[in-house]
Amino acid sequence: TQTSHPAKFHVEGEVYCNVCHSRNLINELSERMAGAQVQLDCKDDSKKVIYSIGGETDQDGVYRLPVVGYHEDCEIKLVKSSRPDCSEIPKLAKGTIQTSKVDLSKNTTITEKTRHVKPLSFRAKTDAPGC
């Protein structure tokens, strides 16, 4: 008989410092951020967080979070910047913070054990030269 083991994944993404305060988008001037803290939260149908894990970016601004089990409604959010000059978490139109959704559900066509998410960025307090 086959034993049932929980699914094991890694969620991987990048964190940048967006040195152009006036732009919300990552661009050619954006800098990868080492030591930034991120958090993965997965919620149930009532929007209650049922799975959560935090992590930190490496020297290349990349984080890799281990995940056990299938989860619905998951997203990565920025928690803390490693740079005092670039610590603002951008807000979206409705005042919510920027997040990256990730599919960790059982009902997906994604078969890779590493799930890649879109990059996130902190915003600098002022524009750098060239913005």
From Swiss-Prot:
**Residues with attached carbohydrate:** N107
Q: Where in the cell is it found?
A: Secreted
Record keywords, A-Z: Allergen, Disulfide bond, Glycoprotein, Metal-binding, Secreted, Zinc
Q: Name one GO molecular function term.
A: zinc ion binding
Which InterPro entries does the protein's record reference? Pollen_Ole_e1_allergen
Q: What is its main location?
A: secreted
Residues bound to Zn(2+): H21, D45, D73, E88
After translation, the protein is modified as follows: Exists in two variants: glycosylated and non-glycosylated. Carries a complex, major N-linked glycan, with a alpha-1,3-fucose residue in its structure and probably also a beta-1,2-xylose. The average modification of molecular mass due to glycosylation is approximately 969 Da.
Question: What are the disulfide bonds?
Answer: C17-C86, C20-C131, C42-C74
Q: Name one Pfam family in it.
A: Pollen_Ole_e_1
A GO CC annotation recorded here is: extracellular region
Per the record, the similarity remark reads: Belongs to the Ole e I family.
- Recorded protein name is Major pollen allergen Pla l 1
